[in-house]
Amino acid sequence: MIQKTNVWKTAAGLLLIISMMISSVPVMAAAAEPVAQAESTETSDYGAPAYGTKAANLHRLTSQEQVQTVSKALQPVADVVGVLTKSHNVSVINYSDVDELGLIRRSDGSGVVLVMDGSRIYIATAAHCLKQNHTEVILPDGTRCSAAVLYRSTETDTGFLTVEYSQLPEEVLGGITPAAGADASALGMKTGDALVAVSSLDSPSSASCIGVLDQLSVIYPNNPGQNVLQFYSETSYGSSGGAVYTQNGIWVGSISGGDTYGTCWAVPYGTILTEFQKCLI
């Protein structure tokens, strides 16, 4: 524990400096979903440049390198948080029926266990991960099972799934726990504080990435009617819906989108709870 604390103290000043440097760059939003690569100039529904566009400059590329440097240096800490929160994180697989060409559309994302009520597991994810008719999840121990879409809000990019206890043996249920959550503001978090973004692409908790908090509340470039957390990290496709944790494993938001250069946005925990209450009414 002493060694872990020292790592964070050593990194704290560097994280704050990186945050201040990157925040001075006029970053534009990228689409929350995967799109074409480098040659693409298409925009999202909100006019935001997509992943892989050429909207780059020397300052922005330098900032990206700084994010990568911090991420590499503190990866052991992210790995610890990944293990600490493993029982909360799931993979989300959403796919269509077979179309007239014999094709199935599929998207992969991440999710977080919000509530277990004795008969159902409630999982929070991103609404844009739930566009198709069928959904399955991979639970922390690797068990794959069907899930039902309970609720989907494109206004806040939040969605909720349910998994019936009756599908699962007791030993699988015993390895799943709801994540403890709180608003970052209620925890007294500030610019420069460390975060860990967990992706469950392919398998639960498959990647844990160090992040640094930039702002507690900004207008979401992908949706100007929404306020989100802004942070810097190396998240990638498949991270959407995944949890953003504090270094102590407290869930403060869920990943919604990010640009090519390390700026990321997360739906705040309080918004997720508010939407969950709506779907239960």
Walk through the language-model features, giving the residues of each.
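Flexible, gly/ser-rich surface segments that form the specificity/activation loops bordering the active-site cleft
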Residues: 104, 171-226, 236-239, 256-265
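A conserved glycine-rich beta-strand in the N-terminal activation segment of trypsin-fold
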Residues: 65-82, 89-122, 145-146, 241, ...
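Bacterial N-terminal signal peptides
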Residues: 13-23
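C-terminal cap/linker of serine protease catalytic domains
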Residues: 42-74, 147, 165, 196, ...
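Catalytic nucleophile loop of clan PA
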Residues: 112, 234-255
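Sec-dependent signal peptide cleavage junction
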Residues: 21-39
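Short conserved beta-strand and strand-loop elements enriched in small hydrophobics
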Residues: 92, 134-141, 193-200
